[in-house]
A protein has these predicted regions:
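Basic, Lys/Arg-enriched alpha-helical interface segments
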Residues: 1-67, 72-89
Length: 89
């Protein structure tokens, strides 16, 4: 279990963002993930002691470029990015 809040690609980056070659878009996803981590750490102050139900998966748009699906898991102090979709021009 982690000592501090963070985010990760779940199950791994190859599965979640593999094939997306637009590095600027990926950087925007990761920047937004950092913001979600800060928000989750403030919302779930108990972190590892949280005993409620984990929030459902949510969707976050990145400009008109694409979106990603994520889930906050308070007990593991993680924001898990499950899927990234890039709308190729």
């Amino acid at each position: 279990m982690a000592d501090a809040w963070g985010w990760e690609y779940d199950p791994d980056s190859d599965f979640v963002i593999g094939g997306i070659d637009n590095l600027a878009f990926v950087a925007k996803v990761e920047e937004r993930a950092d913001e979600l981590v800060r928000a989750a750490s403030a919302l779930y102050l108990g972190g590892t002691k949280y005993d409620g139900i984990s929030p459902l998966m949510q969707e976050e748009s990145i400009d008109a470029s694409g979106l990603f699906v994520y889930q906050v898991i308070p007990r593991h102090q993680r924001v898990c990015i499950r899927r990234v979709i890039f709308f190729a021009a």
